[in-house]
Amino acid sequence: MRIAIIGSGIAGLASAWWLHGEHEVTLFEANDYLGGHTHTHDVQVGGRRMAVDTGFIVFNPRHYPLLTALFDELGVASQPTTMSFSMHSERSGVEYNATSLDGLFCQRRNLLSPRFWGMLADLRRFYRDAQLLLAEDQGPTLGQYLRDQRYGEAFIEEHLLPMASALWSSPTATVMDFPARYLAQFMANHQMLQMTGRSTWRVVKGGSARYVEALRARWQVRERLECPVHSVERTPWGARVHSAAGVEGFDEVILACHSDQALALLGDADAIEREVLGAIRYQPNEAVLHTDASLLPRDRKAWAAWNAHVPRDPAAPCTVSYCMNLLQGLPGDTPLVVTLNRSEAIEPAKVLRTLRYAHPVHDHAAVRAQQRWGELQGRRHTWFAGAYWGWGFHEDGIRSAHRVIDALRACEPHRLAPAFGEVAA
């Protein structure tokens, strides 16, 4: 069959990899690179040339089994990393690194702070009690749960919300609307509701784009870079893809782009597609790669892989800065930092790259829509893959592709109509 895949994030890449040996696959990508959030930049800092990631960074074999299997199949090398977390609050002046006692109490005054000890007590209580949320079908939003259980302001504003905002690249107000069960389930699955026995995380050696290079070196796929798709027109026999390259006919089309992008491409979207895809929103985020150390905690003992920042204005969202030297094991004294949504604080002369990404919003409407995955797949020769079907991470993207490929293969005997030829160039 002739199969079009629209979008080259992990869902599109994995779909193309699993199909290219059996079918004629065309991969459409609007950007000038393949990978989506797999985005590695070659930069020169301090006389050294380094590959720095600004999107997908970390994985671990236990919680990313499909991604790990793909890396093993491709011979992609990886190395262990740290997932240390720090927080600096402009409101309270509190700063800590949760990785060690020395980092936790880098501000020695916190040893005598009832507020700080209350935060730690609430942290232990949350680890224990959040397990009970896993038994609830729907349950409250995170904000409702925290209020009902009377968690302290310090725990909410100086630990849980900054951490969750960093994990999902989402504003704190959005995080408070997440289903509490959803957050607890993610944390439990990733061993984050425990003090010890957590997984070892890893990064791809030389930058995450190395796995994209490995795929491209091995597959037989028609790649359409810098070729935005304008619309997808379904017919009884397949689908026509209208792109910058013209109009082409395919037997099947896999929309491996964001849910809102997929819906925008379907001019003939039906009620089910509008309901499900329309319920999963995306949040835009600006990522800046830079060398400005002022975006990291003031005390170097508090520097961590993930550094959350709580602004003075209570209405302003938390932001996060990733120390890529720690995450990727990059050499040199100059910090290489990726900061989300705080470009105004970065010294312009120290900016290396400015990128724009988008991440799914996991509110109750989105979680309900995820349960309707099967209602969309394969109807009118159209399939939907993307990390938005899960928690929004790389493993969710590749898992969604795996589900689509399994379903597509199961119905192949019924899809015997001839493919369209090329309509226009």
Where do the PLM segments sit?
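N-terminal glycine-rich dinucleotide-binding loop that anchors FAD/FMN and/or NAD(P) in oxidoreductases
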Residues: 41-67
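Mobile amphipathic helical/loop "lid" adjacent to a hydrophobic cofactor/ligand pocket
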Residues: 61-180, 184-185
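Helical element adjacent to the flavin cofactor pocket in flavoenzyme catalytic cores
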Residues: 185-243, 248-251
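Glycine-rich FAD pyrophosphate-binding loop
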Residues: 20-44
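Conserved flavin/dinucleotide-binding core of flavoenzymes
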Residues: 42, 99-102, 316-425
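Mid-domain catalytic core of redox enzymes
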Residues: 228-360
